[in-house]
Amino acid sequence: MTKLTTLLSNQLKNNPKRDIIKDAAMDRWFTCAELQQDVDQLQNLFTAMNLGRGDVVLVCLENSAVFPVINQAAWNLGIIIHPISPTTPIAGLKADWNQFQYPLVLTTDALAEAWTDARFAKSALKVNTAEMQVIADTKQLEHRTDVDHSEVQDEDLGLILNTSGTTGKPKRVGLSHRIMLNAATHDAESNHMTEQDTAMIMMPMFHINAQVMSTLSSRVANARILVTPKFSASRFWQQVADNHVTWVSVVPTIVSFLLLNEKANAAYGRLQSQVNLRFVRSSSFALPEERLRAFQDRFHTLIIEGYGMTEASSQCTTNPHDAPKIGSAGLPFGTEVKILIADHFTDAPGALGEIAIKGDHVITHYLDDEKPESFQDGWFLTGDLGYFDEDGYLFVKGRKKEIISRGGEKVAPAHVESVLSELPFIEQQAVIGMPDDLYGEEVTAVLVSTTPGINEAEQREEILTFGRSHLAKFESPTRVEFVREFPRNTTGKILRPQLREQLLSVGAHR
């Protein structure tokens, strides 16, 4: 066993009667003994399916309390879990399988029903924490003779997560048992977590935020966990009060919704004496200062901003609870952070450049990446721009890359463009992020039509409809703009920053 699986196993076996994870949709707490039953049942399933060390299981499920036990069962055997969005269209799910040949998929009833390939065997699985469909590639599994049952090592991968690249092809981040345990330990220590804490998880379980920052750090601290299907502004404060939630990790969009939602404000007014939040952690993109102050004043709860990413298995910097600096991403914690200017790494105050990170929780390469330009001399180059102030606090000032950040989701423009290119009336296009008060950025499709000035309303609606049916919800354009030509450089490349400024300057509307 690895240090990670030993810790997780001991936690369940040493506290059998303790309630440790609650599923909000089921309105039920699960004891450590019940979770251990699920771990055993899933582990037996994986073994019966001829899975072993190094195999990858694709998981496409809604948020629930089953995720921690799927992980633990798989990690005990050296199996790697790759969670993806449950809103992934069936075409996307099959494309993933065609590329990576997963021997087993755990998914929803709807996606299993749409999966009609005869080579796959489908069966229902019920455990304490969830019901799901199991799709097995019988052609791969039935005649296996080379299953690896050797001892799992700390350097073995346990989790694969997708992170968007500028090419539009998602990059796969492989996180080892060692990396995840280190990251979760840093998270727990920096946020002073104890077994008296209860974390509420609203972020999707195919994100590093939910997987490591919230779930795994809580288990490292022997804290309790409340898993919700998704964020609900109107139910937020009731959930916090009823379940004695002490902290939650969010994106700035959630902070905005809580401030704006009348039901949320009314609920807080009724329940204020029952709310015991120590802090709310906010990351993904900067929270406007006036919104941060408004939240802290209205809800009497500290907001801690930090900076992290999938490649770091969680956070790299965080504001100290006793000395937060509004507008900053805080101080490095468990991470070396430098600013790259030309070929020189520096931490000099005021030096603006690309943020580079290094640490025992940071990956050293992407999976299947033949050109590791993001890695240099042991540093991971984030593609984000920033600087340190005179006190060593990091300020993130934008992205060197073109990735769109929408409510915490990362959207690759090239991927959206490749899908929309199927529409015959698009002559040229560029997908960019435009400022949005709630989501940080909105996915905006800018195009030159084959019929300029004609049928724009119909074409706009067709793009929005086509996007909703062919892309994940967070990738779908919510805004469409028409232009006669794009700003370009001397080689013909579209100048996206100039295009963005052009739309802002003319006050373009949806």
Where are the regions a protein language model picked out?
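Conserved pre-ATP/AMP-binding loop-to-beta segment of ANL
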Residues: 16-17, 143-162, 169, 192-198
